[in-house]
Amino acid sequence: MRFAANLTWLFTESPMLDRPALARQAGFDGVEMLFPYDHPLPDWQAALDGFPVALINTPPGDWAAGERGFAAIPGAEARFRTDFRMALDRAAGLRATRIHVMAGNASGPEAEATFRANLVWAASFGHPLTVEPLNRFDMPGYFLNDYDQAARILDDLSQPDVGIQFDLWHAARIHGDAAAVWARHAARSSHVQIAGFPNRQEPGGGGFDLAAFTGGLPAQGYAGWIAAEYRPARDTLSGLGWLTALRSRNTLIGT
């Protein structure tokens, strides 16, 4: 069982390039980061010092202006391809396991056709990809906003290197029952993110048996990362009891 710290959300008490070392010291097995484009690649490589990177996102565009990626936006195909190549180069330099392809804000049949075509094109490079449904409350207008929608598209495309990014918090926010979402889509999921529900703080609670979930992943054939993407209630280190508890339980049951 491998746990990754999301450096965009955790260890924010320190500068970004100090966070990989802090995550390593805290007992994580690796890291992920949303947008590793604000620092030169050599600086990232020095900061990571060989620490594994589970996932990065494609560039979102101007976040403050509401942009959330371009994969599903008709007419933005050239922008998507430029940004994807940037992500591909950065993933290679960081040795990132997966790239999360951000869909952007769009809707309707033309947006879906654009998303499908861009995913097929991106998958042709052979780097493992993910797509992540984001809930409409926090990401209004985002094209991919339902796990069943994501599954339908991926099943139709049949691209083995493209999987669902299962975010426990978003799954609960969208569908109510995150366990039921996982039961439907576990086989399609290639990356897992965890957080507490409903406050998106430390993992656990919300009626979801997190220990049973993580402990059961190997038996279900899941060999990917479990990434912590949450907002610490206080400082990051004081809230890592969940990591110790999950490691202890999983060690006891042989996972």
Residue ranges and their predicted role:
Residues 19-22, 32-36, 68-69, 76, ...:
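Alpha/beta catalytic barrel-like cores
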Residues 1-4, 8-9, 13-27, 86-89, ...:
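Histidine-acidic metal/acid-base catalytic patches
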Residues 70-163, 253-254:
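Active-site acidic/histidine proton-transfer and metal-coordination neighborhood
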Residues 29-30, 52, 97, 128, ...:
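Residue-level detector of anion-binding/catalytic polar loops
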Residues 9-11, 35-37, 59-61, 103-107, ...:
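Active-site-proximal loop/turn and secondary-structure-junction residues that shape catalytic pockets
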Residues 1-8, 55-71, 134:
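N-terminal small/glycine-rich loop or linker at the start of catalytic domains
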Residues 38-47:
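Active-site-adjacent beta->alpha loops and helix N-cap segments on the catalytic face
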Residues 32, 54-57, 100, 130, ...:
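Conserved beta-strand positions in the central sheet of alpha/beta enzyme cores
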